[in-house]
Amino acid sequence: MKIRIAARGSKLSRIQVDMLGEKLKKIGIEYEIIDIKTKADLFSTDPLSKLGKGVFEKEVNEAVLEGKADIAVHSMKDILSEINPSLEIFAVLERDPPYDILIAEKNLDKLDSNITIGTSSIRRKNFLKYIKPEINTKDIRGNVDTRIRKYLSKEYQGLILAEASLKRLNMTMNYHRLNVYDFTPEANQGIIVALGRKKDEKIKEIFKEINHKDTLDEALAERAVISLVGGGCHSPIGVLFKKEGKEFYGIASYSDGKKKITVSISKPGDPYTIGSELGLLLKKEMKNEDIIP
């Protein structure tokens, strides 16, 4: 049997598909890649905030809905909190490091004033502004290779990226991992997800064999938070859960650049209930500060 996997045509997307594909091969399943151009690819120089929501996923998911592919593979942080009702999460791979990193000559504490850091994420911009208000940020688009090339050419004095991207691309840049209390990651950062058609029971059963349950539980808890308070690349909210045994450890943060709210939780339970509880804690603190999510 050969499974058709839809994904963006970028180098990173191809690597992510192959990571999932290797898991399939181990259980005797072949795969082929269906390259899809997304709005984010076609307008690669425009700010993400201008392109709207779902810019990395819409066309890829449509290929599955239209029967052109069996599975859509994404970085899970790029998919909306409300998945198309005809689609379902079939599997996630074991999570790569979820952290944000700083690529710069010095660590965050020692950065010079008035330098320019490249990031297109409002979350990263606001967290950085709260900690180091004297540092400038500037939008940067393009794949990871392009961003690093701009940094090396001195167009930027630093970059903030997801550590998982560098790991998957096998890049050996020196970097500084950012503390999760200062830079709480975007929900589902570091997770590769496979979406399929709900009605496709045969393929759903195949993907159960490669699903990493603890990672899925972390992902669902984080998605419960953002479904209450918002999240994603257009949001200044970060959330991260770590599951150890039956215990969930979670943190969620918001910043507008001038003030910052952080809440945490530690308890056993099911992902949705614990994630919702953390989301309500953050929502309550935001309301106390007259912030409307």
UniProtKB/Swiss-Prot annotation:
Gene Ontology CC: cytoplasm
Single GO term (MF):
hydroxymethylbilane synthase activity
Write down the chemical reaction(s) this protein catalyses. Answer: 4 porphobilinogen + H2O = hydroxymethylbilane + 4 NH4(+)
Q: What does the record note about the cofactor?
A: Binds 1 dipyrromethane group covalently.
Give EC number(s), comma-separated. Answer: 2.5.1.61
Query: Could you tell me which pathway this protein works in?
Result: Porphyrin-containing compound metabolism; protoporphyrin-IX biosynthesis; coproporphyrinogen-III from 5-aminolevulinate: step 2/4
Q: Which Gene3D superfamilies match?
A: Periplasmic binding protein-like II, Porphobilinogen deaminase, C-terminal domain
| One of the GO biological process terms | protoporphyrinogen IX biosynthetic process
Question: So what family is this one in?
Answer: Belongs to the HMBS family.
Give the function comment from the record.
Answer: Tetrapolymerization of the monopyrrole PBG into the hydroxymethylbilane pre-uroporphyrinogen in several discrete steps.
Record's miscellaneous remark: The porphobilinogen subunits are added to the dipyrromethane group.
What protein is this chain from? Answer: Probable porphobilinogen deaminase
Q: Which organism is it from?
A: Saccharolobus islandicus (strain Y.G.57.14 / Yellowstone #1)
Q: Which gene encodes it?
A: hemC
